[in-house]
Regions:
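Long, low-complexity, charge-biased intrinsically disordered regions
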Residues: 1-160
Length: 160
């Protein structure tokens, strides 16, 4: 996910800035309302990223509503089975094209490297380019399996 990089405050070879982050805490409840477990995730403050410096492209294709209606109409009229899926923590699976640096998570600063920052290799929640990185990763995977995106909707993949 990341590696520690030393930062010289006087001269920095990094073209991008160091993004700060914060912890987001949540508690999950059981159906009866009792506490199931606590959850925590590190979220970077992507709203501080600067276009052209910290990221380039952010566009990620999203399936068009008309495409969903058309596919469901075909499936119903031809009695095809319909399946769906969800990728847990999808945005964390995207590979980054740009160099992105963030501070070490509060409470998890490496005592041997306190002046280092994290060079991210994968996207994190909050990054401007996280949706695009995920889309590129899943599209490449589907292409490897033999699926192709259609001309009418880049988010509709068909198996040839």
């Amino acid at each position: 996910m990341w590696c520690a990089i030393s930062v010289n405050p006087i001269y920095s070879p990094f073209s991008s800035s160091v993004i700060t982050g914060k912890w987001v805490f949540k508690h999950k409840l059981r159906p009866d309302g009792t506490l199931d477990r606590y959850k925590a995730r590190w979220v970077v403050r992507g709203f501080r990223q600067r276009a052209g410096i910290d990221f380039t492209d952010t566009f990620a294709s999203v399936v068009k509503p008309g495409t969903i209606r058309t596919v469901l109409h075909l499936a119903v009229s031809r009695a095809w089975p319909v399946h769906q899926m969800d990728v847990s923590t999808a945005f964390l699976h995207g590979h980054l094209e740009e160099q992105v640096f963030c501070q070490q998570p509060t409470g998890f600063v490496d005592p041997a490297l306190p002046d280092h920052v994290c060079l991210l290799s994968r996207s994190l929640y909050g990054l401007k380019q996280a949706p695009r990185a995920w889309y590129q990763r899943i599209a490449a995977f589907l292409h490897q399996l033999g699926f192709r995106s259609t001309r009418s909707d880049a988010s509709l993949f068909v198996y040839l």
